[in-house]
Amino acid sequence: MVRAIVGANWGDEGKGKITDMFASQADMVIRFQGGANAGHTIINDYGKFALHLLPSGVCQPGTVNIIGNGVALDIEKLVKEIEHVTSAGVPQPNILVSERAQIMMPYHVMLDTYEEERLKDKKFGSTKSGIAPFYSDKYAKIGFQVCELFDEEYLREKLERVCEVKNLLLEHVYHKPTLDVDELFDHMMKLREMVRPYVADTGKIIRQAVKDGKNILLEGQLGSLKDPDFGIYPMVTSSSTLAGFGAVGAGIAPYEIKEIGTVTKAYSSAVGAGEFVSEIFGEEAEKMRNHGGDAGEYGATTGRPRRMGWFDCVATRYGCEAQGATQVALTALDCLSYLDEIKLCVGYEIDGEVTKDFPVTSRLKKAKPVYVTMPGFKCDIRGIREFDKLPKEAQDYVLFIEKEIGVPIKLVSNGPRREEIIVR
């Protein structure tokens, strides 16, 4: 059975913990899109890990961890992550890398950084991980697949063609030093040896696992509102964040995905620029940021403080619909225990009219939040394992969200560790 774990919002919803929990039951965990631009945090007996490329099943003995064809593969960062987890005592994980995955090139990161500098106050808030230039090259058909590392003659000829184009950009748009083909080729040869032990025809392996009835977990990155088609364009990422793309990024038929677990947080947070209707500011935001997560709300990749806001029912309902959610995991409920009252955004006022539909970006810019206020629960709820043992105010909060988003909330996370979860 194939299950996808994806985000309903801007990312940072707590998917890492939920994926880690399901990974303990999975034969195979697959990253199907994105790159090292966002991190999943998991906490277990080995320690705390912010994983950027490795699937969240790396700490599970016997689990096959696959980096699929849809991933932006930064080989150096992948190897560093493997070394990081094994140095913490995690047994050498079983990792496979798709031969069709495309490689993050050094100039992708450079161009990402230079473009943000050029845009100045109009920048996108990129993590400068090279994601947009990478996917631009992929769809312009000048990217490099892993399999091409093993054909030296073809690789050098292609590098010469691609560098000619990149050097025009570097010299005339960004006024930066140009690329040296020989240096880049030598670098690619080093990458080849680093990734060689992991390369496989993962699509074939995954399809066989589906036929054999294995438990397969598709691990998404970021969330619905960062999808390039259905997100808050242009403040989005460059690969689809939706469960539907999981089939493409792993190499299986779409009808094989039987469950879509969509993750949302009990409040809202976002990194980077873009519309955020329920955002809060100042001391109110700082308090929520410091109470959030397991060590405050700061980006796992950049360390930047996340923007904070109240739970947005409009955005989350839309995010769940875009994902095709069959069930929801609500995370970080315990982080709200300091509040006397909790607000939820239940509608948007746009040009004097209230709507519960999530609009396109041009209208979203005009939206003002419509709030309801609920009483807080003002007590430590960590350690509680049954829903009906939660304070009534906490139960009411969860049930209100469930009614608003229209998808059953099956999991409620009340702490950062894997075992701190309530199954309904």
Predicted segments with their positions:
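Non-transmembrane, aqueous-exposed alpha-helical and coiled segments at domain scale
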Residues: 1-424
